[in-house]
């Protein structure tokens, strides 16, 4: 793209404003007007148009020149007093008479090349836009793939570990229950041992009491036997004394007196003693039987009382054991329920933490995706604006091309000769005057539009 700024002044007094871009459009020979029309117009049409409308002719709205002329278009007009306009510009005044040089085809070719370059530029930008969209889609997919990696294996590992932890907790709970059951069984056996010890002590006490009674009975029997022996000895002593007394009396009396008395026969002492002995033996036997019966009755009563007490004690102990077992079972169940409650609370806390973390990750991912979406929308809006700008540029360039073509066609009809072919024919180019059907400013306005 080639353009330059010109601040040279025209001999007629019109000065190009600094910054006004003088773009040479076509390599058409300058047609200088006759000397009589030199005071009417001496300025180039395109320069007047650019200077009057303050429009950068041939430039894009982006501030870049869109016209690149061949080197032949930069040769100055050899006529003295001209506006320093290149000599191959085909329009030098508004009153030319169908005069065109031999560069018309080159100019049209240049304009066509310019249009082709612009269309190529548009196609290139569209292709770049499509490539950018493809790149954005790929990057969004890659970003999704990087932002959302596959955590399924980790999740499976975590689930397996959680299952193992739950199994371990259940095994621990089962072992705790077994330990509690063993403790309860040990307590039961300890209670049974204590009850057996108490029963053994009771039996030992009963045995001691019975042994004491038996000893008392044995002592009573020994006393009775001693009394019996003493009575027997007394009987024997009495008998021996009686016999001795009888012998003494017989010895004292001798045979002096023989007195016969008609008396009843004497009582048989042996028989009497035998009867007494039998009576005493019967009494001893009766007393012994009575003592034995009393001892048996007392023993049976005490044993029955002990048995009833032991039965009542066993019933109470069995009830106590049942109640203790029930209490222990309820305590174990309560502990198991507490353990289950703690496990469920821990699982709930872990699930809440895990889902809270996942929710935070999802929210961060959503925020990232929303930011990316906003960036993509901003990029799309920017590209759409650039595309609209390019479409506007395209429309303006097409309008410029149409304007240039109309100008070329009108000047082709208006310039009949080339008075600038010889240096001596004219000394200066007349100023551009009014033309039928419009002015250069009007053309500039149409170009600006």
From Swiss-Prot:
One of the entry's Gene Ontology molecular-function terms is: structural molecule activity
Q: Which InterPro entries match?
A: IF_conserved (IPR018039), IF_rod_dom (IPR039008), Keratin_I (IPR002957)
Q: Which SUPFAM superfamilies match?
A: Intermediate filament protein, coiled coil region
Where do the IF rod domain residues begin and end? 104-415
Q: What UniProt keywords are attached to this protein's entry?
A: Coiled coil, Intermediate filament, Keratin
The entry's family comment says: Belongs to the intermediate filament family.
Give the protein name, as stated in the record.
Keratin, type I cuticular Ha7
**Origin species:** Homo sapiens (Human)
């Amino acid at each position: 793209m080639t353009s330059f700024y010109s601040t040279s002044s025209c001999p007629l007094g019109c000065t190009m404003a600094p910054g006004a871009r003088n773009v040479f459009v076509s390599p058409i020979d300058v047609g200088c007007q006759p000397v009589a029309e030199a005071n009417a117009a001496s300025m180039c049409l395109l320069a007047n148009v650019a200077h009057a409308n303050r429009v950068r002719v041939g430039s894009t709205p982006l501030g870049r020149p869109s016209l690149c002329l061949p080197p032949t278009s930069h040769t100055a007009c050899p006529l003295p007093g001209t506006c320093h306009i290149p000599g191959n510009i085909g329009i030098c005044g508004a009153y030319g008479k169908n005069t065109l040089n031999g560069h018309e085809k080159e100019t049209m070719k240049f304009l066509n090349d310019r249009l082709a370059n612009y269309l190529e530029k548009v196609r290139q930008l569209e292709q770049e836009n499509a490539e950018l969209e493809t790149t954005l889609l790929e990057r969004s997919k890659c970003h999704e793939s990087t932002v959302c990696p596959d955590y399924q294996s980790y999740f499976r590992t975590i689930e397996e570990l959680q299952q193992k932890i739950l199994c371990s907790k259940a095994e621990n709970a089962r072992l705790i229950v077994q330990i509690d059951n063993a403790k309860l069984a040990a307590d039961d056996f300890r209670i049974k041992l204590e009850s057996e010890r108490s029963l053994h002590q009771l039996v030992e006490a009963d045995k001691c009491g019975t042994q004491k009674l038996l000893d008392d009975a044995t002592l009573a029997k020994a006393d009775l036997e001693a009394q019996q022996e003493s009575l027997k000895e007394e009987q024997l002593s009495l008998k021996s004394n009686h016999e001795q007394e009888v012998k003494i009396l017989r010895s004292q009396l001798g045979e002096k007196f023989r007195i016969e008395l008609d008396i009843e026969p004497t009582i048989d002492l042996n028989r009497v003693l035998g009867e007494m002995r039998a009576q005493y033996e019967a009494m001893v036997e009766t007393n012994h039987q009575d003592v034995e019966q009393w001892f048996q009755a007392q023993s049976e009563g005490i044993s029955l009382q002990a048995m009833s007490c032991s039965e009542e004690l066993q019933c109470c102990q069995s009830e106590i054991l049942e109640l203790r077992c029930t209490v222990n079972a309820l305590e174990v169940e309560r502990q198991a329920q507490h353990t289950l409650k703690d496990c469920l609370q821990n699982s709930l806390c872990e699930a809440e933490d895990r889902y809270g973390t996942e929710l935070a990750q999802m929210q961060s991912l959503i925020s990232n995706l929303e930011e990316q979406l906003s960036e993509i929308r901003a990029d799309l809006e920017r590209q759409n604006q650039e595309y609209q700008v390019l479409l506007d540029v395209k429309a303006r360039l097409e309008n410029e091309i149409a304007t240039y073509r109309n100008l070329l066609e009108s000047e082709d009809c208006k310039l009949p000769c080339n008075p600038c072919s010889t240096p001596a024919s004219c000394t200066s180019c007349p100023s551009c005057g009014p033309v039928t059907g419009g002015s250069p400013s009007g053309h500039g306005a149409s170009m600006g539009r």
